Protein backbone atom coordinates (compact mmCIF):
# COMPACT_ATOMS: atom_id res chain seq x y z
CA UNK A 1 0.00 0.00 0.00
CA UNK A 2 2.82 2.40 0.88
CA UNK A 3 4.59 1.60 -2.40
CA UNK A 4 1.40 2.11 -4.41
CA UNK A 5 0.83 5.48 -2.74
CA UNK A 6 4.34 6.74 -3.50
CA UNK A 7 5.96 6.40 -0.07
CA UNK A 8 9.17 5.10 -1.67
CA UNK A 9 9.34 7.58 -4.55
CA UNK A 10 12.86 9.00 -4.68
CA UNK A 11 14.16 6.37 -2.27
CA UNK A 12 17.57 4.99 -3.23
CA UNK A 13 17.82 2.38 -0.51
CA UNK A 14 15.33 0.51 1.64
CA UNK A 15 16.00 -2.20 4.17
CA UNK A 16 13.69 -4.68 5.86
CA UNK A 17 14.40 -6.19 9.26
CA UNK A 18 12.33 -9.25 10.11
CA UNK A 19 12.31 -11.32 13.30
CA UNK A 20 13.77 -14.79 12.96
CA UNK A 21 14.94 -17.52 15.33
CA UNK A 22 18.54 -16.93 14.19
CA UNK A 23 20.66 -14.15 12.72
CA UNK A 24 20.55 -14.00 8.94
CA UNK A 25 21.65 -11.24 6.62
CA UNK A 26 19.09 -11.96 3.90
CA UNK A 27 16.46 -14.50 2.99
CA UNK A 28 15.25 -15.60 -0.42
CA UNK A 29 11.52 -15.25 -1.04
CA UNK A 30 8.99 -16.40 -3.60
CA UNK A 31 6.73 -14.29 -5.80
CA UNK A 32 3.08 -14.56 -4.71
CA UNK A 33 -0.46 -13.85 -5.86
CA UNK A 34 -3.43 -14.06 -3.50
CA UNK A 35 -7.10 -14.35 -4.46
CA UNK A 36 -10.51 -14.93 -3.00
CA UNK A 37 -12.67 -17.21 -5.15
CA UNK A 38 -16.43 -16.86 -4.68
CA UNK A 39 -19.02 -19.18 -6.21
CA UNK A 40 -22.63 -18.09 -6.57
CA UNK A 41 -25.04 -20.98 -6.96
CA UNK A 42 -28.65 -21.49 -5.89
CA UNK A 43 -29.79 -22.57 -2.44
CA UNK A 44 -32.26 -25.45 -2.25
CA UNK A 45 -33.44 -28.00 0.31
CA UNK A 46 -31.11 -30.98 0.06
CA UNK A 47 -33.91 -33.55 0.48
CA UNK A 48 -37.05 -31.92 -0.89
CA UNK A 49 -35.77 -29.98 -3.95
CA UNK A 50 -32.09 -30.81 -4.55
CA UNK A 51 -32.64 -30.67 -8.32
CA UNK A 52 -33.37 -26.95 -8.01
CA UNK A 53 -30.05 -26.19 -6.34
CA UNK A 54 -26.68 -25.20 -7.73
CA UNK A 55 -24.18 -26.36 -5.14
CA UNK A 56 -21.50 -23.70 -4.69
CA UNK A 57 -19.61 -25.90 -2.21
CA UNK A 58 -19.37 -28.63 -4.85
CA UNK A 59 -17.75 -26.07 -7.16
CA UNK A 60 -15.00 -25.58 -4.56
CA UNK A 61 -14.63 -29.35 -4.26
CA UNK A 62 -14.10 -29.62 -8.03
CA UNK A 63 -11.53 -26.79 -7.88
CA UNK A 64 -9.67 -28.47 -5.01
CA UNK A 65 -9.59 -31.81 -6.83
CA UNK A 66 -8.26 -30.00 -9.90
CA UNK A 67 -5.56 -28.31 -7.82
CA UNK A 68 -4.59 -31.67 -6.33
CA UNK A 69 -4.24 -33.19 -9.79
CA UNK A 70 -2.35 -30.13 -11.02
CA UNK A 71 0.37 -30.50 -8.37
CA UNK A 72 2.21 -33.27 -10.24
CA UNK A 73 2.61 -30.90 -13.19
CA UNK A 74 3.94 -27.93 -11.21
CA UNK A 75 7.56 -26.88 -11.01
CA UNK A 76 9.21 -28.06 -7.81
CA UNK A 77 9.34 -24.48 -6.47
CA UNK A 78 5.67 -23.72 -7.18
CA UNK A 79 3.28 -23.71 -4.23
CA UNK A 80 -0.52 -23.56 -4.07
CA UNK A 81 -2.29 -23.43 -0.72
CA UNK A 82 -5.59 -22.19 0.59
CA UNK A 83 -8.67 -22.62 2.72
CA UNK A 84 -12.42 -22.73 2.34
CA UNK A 85 -13.72 -19.57 3.99
CA UNK A 86 -17.43 -20.26 3.45
CA UNK A 87 -19.01 -23.59 2.63
CA UNK A 88 -22.65 -23.50 3.64
CA UNK A 89 -24.93 -22.98 6.62
CA UNK A 90 -26.56 -26.36 7.31
CA UNK A 91 -26.19 -29.95 6.13
CA UNK A 92 -29.75 -30.08 4.79
CA UNK A 93 -29.36 -26.97 2.62
CA UNK A 94 -27.54 -26.97 -0.70
CA UNK A 95 -25.21 -23.98 -0.34
CA UNK A 96 -25.86 -21.19 -2.79
CA UNK A 97 -22.67 -19.37 -1.78
CA UNK A 98 -19.18 -20.71 -1.13
CA UNK A 99 -15.76 -19.08 -0.97
CA UNK A 100 -12.10 -19.99 -0.75
CA UNK A 101 -8.88 -18.01 -0.29
CA UNK A 102 -5.82 -19.28 -2.12
CA UNK A 103 -2.19 -18.19 -2.35
CA UNK A 104 0.06 -19.34 -5.16
CA UNK A 105 3.80 -18.81 -5.20
CA UNK A 106 6.66 -19.32 -7.62
CA UNK A 107 10.33 -18.44 -7.94
CA UNK A 108 9.77 -15.15 -9.77
CA UNK A 109 7.07 -13.02 -11.35
CA UNK A 110 7.49 -14.66 -14.75
CA UNK A 111 7.03 -18.17 -13.33
CA UNK A 112 4.09 -16.87 -11.29
CA UNK A 113 2.46 -15.58 -14.48
CA UNK A 114 2.72 -19.12 -15.90
CA UNK A 115 1.27 -20.70 -12.73
CA UNK A 116 -1.62 -18.27 -12.23
CA UNK A 117 -3.79 -19.26 -15.22
CA UNK A 118 -3.42 -22.94 -14.28
CA UNK A 119 -4.73 -22.22 -10.77
CA UNK A 120 -7.58 -20.09 -12.06
CA UNK A 121 -8.51 -22.80 -14.59
CA UNK A 122 -9.12 -25.21 -11.71
CA UNK A 123 -11.60 -22.76 -10.20
CA UNK A 124 -13.22 -22.17 -13.60
CA UNK A 125 -13.65 -25.95 -13.88
CA UNK A 126 -15.64 -25.86 -10.64
CA UNK A 127 -18.00 -23.32 -12.14
CA UNK A 128 -18.38 -25.25 -15.38
CA UNK A 129 -19.00 -28.57 -13.63
CA UNK A 130 -21.70 -27.24 -11.30
CA UNK A 131 -23.25 -24.32 -13.13
CA UNK A 132 -22.18 -21.90 -10.40
CA UNK A 133 -20.92 -18.43 -11.27
CA UNK A 134 -17.30 -17.74 -10.32
CA UNK A 135 -16.13 -14.35 -9.04
CA UNK A 136 -12.36 -13.92 -8.54
CA UNK A 137 -11.13 -11.10 -6.29
CA UNK A 138 -7.35 -10.50 -6.19
CA UNK A 139 -6.22 -9.50 -2.69
CA UNK A 140 -3.80 -6.94 -4.08
CA UNK A 141 -1.04 -6.87 -6.66
CA UNK A 142 1.32 -9.82 -7.05
CA UNK A 143 4.46 -9.56 -4.93
CA UNK A 144 7.81 -10.15 -6.54
CA UNK A 145 10.61 -12.37 -5.37
CA UNK A 146 13.10 -10.34 -3.30
CA UNK A 147 15.93 -8.78 -5.33
CA UNK A 148 18.88 -8.47 -2.95
CA UNK A 149 21.63 -5.83 -3.04
CA UNK A 150 24.64 -7.96 -2.13
CA UNK A 151 26.90 -4.95 -1.53
CA UNK A 152 24.43 -3.61 1.03
CA UNK A 153 24.09 -7.07 2.59
CA UNK A 154 27.87 -7.26 2.98
CA UNK A 155 28.04 -3.87 4.71
CA UNK A 156 25.11 -4.77 6.99
CA UNK A 157 26.72 -8.06 7.95
CA UNK A 158 30.14 -6.50 8.54
CA UNK A 159 28.64 -3.84 10.81
CA UNK A 160 26.45 -6.33 12.70
CA UNK A 161 29.40 -8.69 13.27
CA UNK A 162 31.46 -5.76 14.58
CA UNK A 163 28.70 -5.36 17.19
CA UNK A 164 28.95 -9.02 18.21
CA UNK A 165 26.14 -10.54 16.12
CA UNK A 166 26.78 -14.12 14.95
CA UNK A 167 25.13 -15.16 11.70
CA UNK A 168 23.78 -18.58 10.78
CA UNK A 169 24.85 -20.12 7.49
CA UNK A 170 22.74 -18.75 4.63
CA UNK A 171 19.54 -20.64 3.96
CA UNK A 172 19.22 -22.41 0.64
CA UNK A 173 15.47 -22.92 1.13
CA UNK A 174 13.32 -20.39 -0.64
CA UNK A 175 10.12 -19.86 1.33
CA UNK A 176 7.64 -17.17 2.21
CA UNK A 177 6.82 -13.96 0.43
CA UNK A 178 6.67 -10.28 1.30
CA UNK A 179 5.23 -7.07 -0.09
CA UNK A 180 8.64 -5.50 0.59
CA UNK A 181 9.95 -7.46 -2.39
CA UNK A 182 8.10 -5.06 -4.71
CA UNK A 183 10.16 -2.23 -3.23
CA UNK A 184 13.29 -4.14 -4.31
CA UNK A 185 12.32 -4.06 -8.00
What are these regions (language model features)?
Residues 61-185:
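Metal-dependent amide/peptide-bond hydrolase catalytic core
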Amino acid sequence: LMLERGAFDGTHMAMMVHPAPQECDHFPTLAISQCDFHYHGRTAHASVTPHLGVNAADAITVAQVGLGLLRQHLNSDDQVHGIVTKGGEAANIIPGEASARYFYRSTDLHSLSVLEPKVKACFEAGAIATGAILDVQPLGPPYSEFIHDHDLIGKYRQNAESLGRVFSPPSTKVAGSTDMANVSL
